[in-house]
């Protein structure tokens, strides 16, 4: 039996692993012209602005080339230039007419550029025209499941598997839907079959092992849960390559940057932007699995606030543009100090425009909340750009955080590579939160720490506290945040959990795995003590 290549549920169809590469002529789409190949090469080495110029040049030179329109739209969307991306896709849609293959590619592109409703429309049109594109069933099912339309998603997956019985990624998603539909026996049977299927892509196997681990955890079979999760992590460890070493190099530099800063730097930066229009914004950060998603969803239910959920815009695009030059490949205190006010003004506006584009609505007079746990390590840069920002820091028992980070599957990246062993996860937690503890003694910006344990025990009290900190009046409707989630897609990996009623069973979860966590406890002790756990 032959399996399709794993696509991490369609998230990997990006310019880093383009769908449209290989031969120079792509039937039905056009020529993969040299400009596009060079642009992809630049993109892969993070030379994004140069890549965008080449993508757009290709569209200008070859206006009928559908490959150029698709690649350019995805590149622009990835850089939050969404209006320009939509213009490209409008042209693609005119060319598509009744071609399901083009409509499918357009649907993928709309999904990538934060336009899920347009993506849904495209995939529906595909399925009305043909049953020969199983991917379209899976794409649409995933979009529905994110909106908790589980029954409709399941019907689509059944259709998908009738069209492509050997589509193992669809089998994996079917098993997840069965779990959500409370058919644990059928779900586990599928997960186990996939985990041990040597024809399945290793990442499909890894995800199946993670689901098996979660089932054992729910059944309080903690040793079995850990064994299953170790099988998942073993597969990922074999694929990490040099990712961890590269991440460690950057992290070491960021630690040094935080250590070099003084209160005087932050005071000086606040004074430097006094002439610029003040923005009403806040950052919600800390560390993954610390309760940021729950707090964000509660606050986002307030009429005076709008949140952006884990956008990459600042860390990937804005922050490097602040300081990066051929002579400054990594941020330094001197480089941050030397940023001219004109550049700060332009980048502040660029950040705001990116967020509004992804939200697909103006922020207006509302508070903008940038929820992003990994932002902790680049907070100096954010506060250089926006000294007026308020900081909400989510706290949770460090031991529970580390167990929670380890006990899930995440696609490999510079953050998740730390979650492949418990000891690494503990080291990364201590790294990030030690940086926060240093920063809170130096920064001039207001900050507030909110404990997950307090939030799940008394949501109203902590919601009132956070809203008051943000300068917003109390609105009882925020306590009904779950009603909004029934039709709202959440980007965080915890989108399913946050839609459930509040529960306290995750408090002290680490005790179930104490034997395995033991080597990491001394690493976490400074944070345990500092945060009062």
Cite the ranges covered by each PLM segment:
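Phosphate-binding active sites in nucleotide-utilizing proteins
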Residues: 275-386, 394
């Amino acid at each position: 039996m032959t399996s399709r290549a794993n696509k991490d549920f369609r998230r990997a169809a990006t310019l880093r692993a383009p769908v449209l590469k290989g031969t120079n002529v792509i039937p039905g789409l056009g020529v993969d012209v040299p400009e596009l190949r060079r642009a992809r090469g630049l993109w892969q080495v993070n030379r994004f602005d140069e890549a965008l110029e080449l993508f757009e040049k290709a569209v200008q030179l070859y206006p009928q080339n559908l490959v150029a329109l698709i690649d350019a739209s995805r590149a622009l969307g990835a850089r939050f230039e969404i209006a320009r991306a939509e213009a490209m896709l409008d042209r693609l849609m005119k060319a598509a007419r009744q071609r399901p293959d083009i409509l499918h590619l357009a649907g993928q592109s709309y999904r990538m550029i934060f336009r899920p409703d347009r993506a849904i429309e495209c995939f529906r049109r595909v399925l009305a025209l043909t049953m020969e594109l199983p991917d379209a069933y899976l794409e649409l099912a995933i979009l529905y499941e994110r909106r908790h339309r589980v029954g409709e998603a399941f019907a689509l997956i059944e259709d998908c598997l009738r069209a492509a019985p050997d589509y193992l990624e669809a089998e994996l998603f079917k098993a997840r839907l069965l779990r959500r539909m409370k058919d644990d026996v059928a779900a586990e049977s599928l997960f186990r079959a996939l985990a041990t299927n040597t024809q399945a892509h290793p990442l499909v196997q890894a995800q199946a092992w993670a689901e098996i681990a979660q089932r054992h955890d729910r059944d309080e079979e903690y040793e079995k849960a850990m064994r299953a999760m170790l099988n998942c992590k073993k597969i990922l460890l074999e694929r990490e390559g040099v990712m961890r070493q590269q991440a460690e190099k950057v992290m070491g530099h960021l630690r040094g940057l935080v250590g070099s800063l003084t209160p005087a730097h932050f005071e000086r930066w606040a004074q430097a932007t006094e002439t610029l229009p003040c923005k009403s914004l806040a950052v919600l950060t800390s560390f993954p699995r610390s309760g940021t998603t729950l707090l964000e969803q509660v606050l986002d239910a307030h009429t005076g606030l709008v949140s952006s959920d884990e956008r990459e815009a600042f860390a990937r695009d804005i922050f490097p543009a602040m300081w990066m030059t051929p002579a400054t490949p990594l941020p330094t205190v001197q480089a941050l100090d030397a940023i001219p006010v004109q550049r700060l003004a332009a980048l502040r506006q660029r950040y705001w425009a990116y967020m509004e584009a992804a939200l697909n609505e103006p922020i207006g007079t509302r508070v903008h909340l940038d929820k992003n746990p990994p932002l902790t390590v680049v907070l100096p840069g954010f506060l250089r750009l926006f000294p007026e920002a308020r900081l909400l820091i989510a706290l949770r028992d460090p031991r529970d955080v580390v167990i929670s980070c380890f006990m899930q599957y995440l696609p490999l990246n510079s953050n998740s590579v730390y979650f492949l062993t418990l000891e690494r996860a503990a080291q990364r937690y201590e790294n990030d939160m030690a940086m926060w503890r240093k920063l809170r003694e130096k920064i001039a910006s207001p900050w507030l720490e909110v404990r997950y344990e307090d939030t799940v025990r008394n949501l109203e009290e902590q919601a009132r506290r956070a809203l008051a900190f943000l300068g917003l009046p109390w609105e009882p409707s925020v306590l009904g945040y779950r009603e909004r989630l029934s039709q709202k897609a959440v980007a965080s990996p915890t989108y399913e959990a946050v839609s459930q009623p509040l529960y306290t069973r995750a408090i002290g979860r680490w005790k179930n795995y104490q034997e395995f966590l033991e080597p990491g406890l001394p690493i976490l002790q400074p944070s345990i003590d500092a945060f009062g756990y």
